[in-house]
Amino acid sequence: VQLMNDKLGVFRHQKIGAQYAYKPQLLGGTLSLGVQVSLLMESLDGTQLDAGQGNDPALPTTQVTGNGVDFALGAYYMRGNLYVGLSAQHLTSPVITLGDKYELPISPTYYLTGGYNIKLRNPFVTIKPSALLRTDGSSYRADVTTRVVYTHEKRVLYAGLGYSPTISVTGMIGGSFHGIIIGYSYEMYTSAIK
């Protein structure tokens, strides 16, 4: 089960999803093939928008909400300390109707990731550098991230930094508590939001 709550400016993106993965052994490693079905809930707080003088009919003046069904697929392969993954979200290209007259089209997004887990002399600490490339077919974004992960007797804590060239720097912390993974990240933009 996946729960997500993300706020960016006047938008709030929420998702609840169910996932399933099949994990066969392949070439000395593990291949994970996954599928996800989700309910997307989107809202836009029009009371926070400044349309300047007069009213712009293209912008709502109240809070508007809508929802839609979404579908995703992914494949992930891990062998030893090396991993690589490929996935696609929003394969149904949902169009969320916000209120009575506003539409939010959501394009499919494709991801390619890879990384390596570096074991240190301290058996409880691992450094995990990784890279992520994502595209919706018209634009792309690349991120490089390094996390330091502490693992001991089912306890997992992590902290890390991420960098997206010309876009942002991200800090993150989190851990596993009673089998539930909880994390927080903050992204600081280094250029104007596009």
Regions found by a protein language model. Give the residues of each.
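Subset of outer-membrane beta-barrel
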Residues: 1-194
